[in-house]
Amino acid sequence: MLIVYGGAFNPPTKAHYQIAKYLLEKYQDANLIFLPTSTKYAKADLVSNDHRYQMLEIVSKKLGKRASCSRYELDQEEFKGTYYSLQHFKGCYYVMGADNFNYIEKWINYPNLVIENKFIIVPRLGDDVEAKILSNEILTKYRDNFIVLNDFKKIDLSASLYRKTKEEDILLDEVLEYIKMHNLY
């Protein structure tokens, strides 16, 4: 089983680490690849591709040999969307937070994105992923393409919270050290 964990990781937090660790423990035969979004994606305040990649390398090493990081999206000449990336990682399970899942209809190549791929959804506090699925005809029809991690202990940490507050306990010590060394955020 191949698990691809995509996102901005701006920066990678303890929540990202704990989700990846949980998935590797739950799926003993799985390998996990972090797939950071390129700065070519129209998202404000992303630090450089290289810095986010290096921070994910730190997280991957801490997780062990079944975790790695891909430059696939970072090295594309233009942002083409998750659908295009999942064509490259054919047959994988794509991990996303419920905050992103709530807007999946707006993603490039929806509904084919949902029809042709499998997803692992990580709920956040207050999210009702099942209600979201049942409220949408395509999501309901392809319900079997979604694994919802309802048994995962929800963590109320986010990269945006770190960027806003600079609260150091949101990050792994090694990531925090990297951020301080390079004067990021």
Where are these predicted regions, by residue range?
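Nucleotidyltransferase catalytic core that binds NTPs
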Residues: M1-Y185
